[in-house]
Design a protein with these regions (language model features):
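Functionally important transmembrane alpha-helices
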Residues: 184-240
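Interfacial helix-loop-helix junctions of multi-pass membrane proteins
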Residues: 173-189
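N-terminal, membrane-interfacial amphipathic/helix-forming hydrophobic leader that caps
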Residues: 1-76, 220-223, 227-264
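Membrane-interface helix/loop boundary segments of multi-pass membrane proteins
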Residues: 136-163, 203-207
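Hydrophobic cores of alpha-helical transmembrane segments in multi-pass inner/ER membrane proteins
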Residues: 56-67, 94-97, 126-140, 196, ...
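Juxtamembrane helix-loop-helix connectors linking adjacent transmembrane helices
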Residues: 9-15, 39-51, 68-137, 143-149, ...
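Active-site His/Glu-centered metal-binding helix of metallohydrolases
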Residues: 132-137, 141-142, 146, 170, ...
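Aromatic-anchored segments of alpha-helical transmembrane domains
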Residues: 24-33, 97-105, 165-174, 216-226
Length: 264
């Protein structure tokens, strides 16, 4: 299957892609520190949060551009997309579970719409910034990096999804700078599962834009601004097992299907 992977055609070496990922991730993480000279009193005000959101979006766009450049300037996983065939039934089940997950998010979207105009704009800007940059960093550049490294392995898609999603989850430990360990650890677990879901979407669609849109939609929440706790451990574990489990199963079955198709 390696010959059909877009990442194997990338002119950048593994070391160049790795350095690019590390540098761009650090820049993205530190984006909130750029306006430190304005002082906490202003930055915690409505205008301050809006300004930070605008700066975050600008930096996110720049990082996303360079991430895609080092990923090979392509949104594809496969050079030629392999049809799902009999795997469609599992894809349908995956879509149902994702729909239920987003249906549960609807209450947060309603909460956002009841906030002030400035707060709504701030939340939307932050969601777009995160959706764009994090997808192009983790589901484009890092995923492609792992597919290039593991291109000779049979289950390259599965391992690339697992490793990039674990990195995506671990990256959220930077939030320890502003919140306690329990909240952060909950985020790491939840985000790792969401990362698997987004990898599944990218693999099945052979594109980037649907998972960018879904990431943005997932981040449209009042919690983006307030930083409140995610929820109870039971809810985190159950939802993580459901979405992470169905994502892993879908990728594994599709990866196996791709191997069989390549032998024909």
């Amino acid at each position: 299957m390696g010959n059909n992977l877009e990442a194997t055609k990338n002119k950048y070496s593994i070391s160049q892609m790795t350095i690019a990922f590390v540098v761009l991730t650090v820049v993205y993480i530190l984006r909130g520190k750029i306006l430190f000279f304005l002082g906490p009193s202003f930055l915690n005000s409505g205008n301050g949060k809006l300004l930070q959101a605008i700066v975050s979006l600008v930096i996110a766009l720049i990082c996303a551009h360079f991430a895609n450049k080092f990923a090979g300037k392509s949104f594809k996983v496969f050079i030629k997309r392999i049809e799902q065939g009999k795997v469609r039934w599992l894809t349908a089940l995956f879509c149902v579970i994702v729909f239920i997950l987003y249906l549960a998010k609807a209450s947060q979207w309603v909460q956002v719409m009841h906030k002030s105009v400035m707060s709504i704009i701030t939340i939307l800007l932050l969601a777009v910034a995160a959706g764009l940059c994090e997808e192009f960093l983790f589901r484009d550049l890092l995923f492609n990096l792992f597919t290039k490294i593991l291109s000779k392995r049979r289950y390259v898609l599965l391992w690339s999804a697992i490793l990039s999603s674990i990195c995506f989850g671990l990256a959220h430990f930077v939030n320890l700078a502003r919140q306690d360990f329990v909240v952060t650890f909950q985020q790491v677990i939840a985000v790792t599962a969401i990362g698997l879901m987004l990898c599944t979407i990218r693999i099945l669609t052979n594109n980037m834009w649907l998972n960018v849109i879904m990431h943005i939609a997932f981040d449209i929440s009042p919690l983006v601004v307030t930083g409140d706790i995610i929820g109870k451990w039971s809810a985190i574990i159950v939802s993580g097992l459901w979405i992470g489990g169905i994502s892993l199963l879908t990728i594994w079955v599709y990866n196996h299907h791709c191997l069989k198709e390549n032998l024909k």
